């Protein structure tokens, strides 16, 4: 006996570990998935950097006309007036969600609910 240790059989283990990402039967690779919360944080950073409106313009315009219809029929809106309403509505909603998030954090929660 020369005192040398027998080589370990790790090659099979490594191959088995590597093949866990590939379906053994069909050979189809599983799609990459981010950990929960990673994409949400990335979206938060992206939207905080941007200044564009987040609600689509035409659906918002239809909503404004629908609400205005209840008060007076045949009202007309300048395009700038609808944009001003949308800016104000989005600013209000962003502030509301910020306050809601602070309340959730204060209550040691991560999910906000209606």
UniProtKB/Swiss-Prot annotation:
InterPro entries: Histone-fold, Histone_H2A/H2B/H3, Histone_H3/CENP-A
Known partners and oligomeric status: The nucleosome is a histone octamer containing two molecules each of H2A, H2B, H3 and H4 assembled in one H3-H4 heterotetramer and two H2A-H2B heterodimers. The octamer wraps approximately 147 bp of DNA.
Subcellular location: Nucleus; Chromosome
Family recorded in the similarity comment: Belongs to the histone H3 family.
Function as written in the Swiss-Prot or TrEMBL entry: Core component of nucleosome. Nucleosomes wrap and compact DNA into chromatin, limiting DNA accessibility to the cellular machineries which require DNA as a template. Histones thereby play a central role in transcription regulation, DNA repair, DNA replication and chromosomal stability. DNA accessibility is regulated via a complex set of post-translational modifications of histones, also called histone code, and nucleosome remodeling.
Region (Disordered): 1-29
Membrane-crossing residue ranges in chain numbering: none
Name of the protein: Histone H3-5
Entry keywords, A to Z: Chromosome, DNA-binding, Nucleosome core, Nucleus
MF terms (GO), sorted A to Z: DNA binding; protein heterodimerization activity; structural constituent of chromatin
One term under GO cellular component: nucleosome
Domain of life per record: Eukaryota
PROSITE patterns: HISTONE_H3_1 (PS00322), HISTONE_H3_2 (PS00959)
Source organism of this protein record: Stylonychia lemnae (Ciliate)
């Amino acid at each position: 006996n020369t005192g040398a240790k027998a080589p370990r059989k790790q090659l099979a283990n490594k191959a088995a570990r590597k093949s866990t990402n590939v379906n053994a039967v069909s050979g189809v690779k599983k799609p990459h998935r981010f950990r929960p919360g990673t994409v949400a944080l990335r979206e938060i950073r992206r939207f905080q950097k941007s200044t564009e409106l987040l609600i689509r313009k035409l659906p918002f315009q239809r909503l404004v006309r629908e609400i205005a219809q209840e008060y007076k029929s045949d009202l007309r809106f300048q395009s700038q007036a609808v944009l001003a309403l949308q800016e104000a509505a989005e600013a209000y909603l962003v502030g509301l969600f910020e306050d809601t998030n602070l309340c959730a954090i204060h209550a040691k929660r991560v999910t906000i609910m209606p």
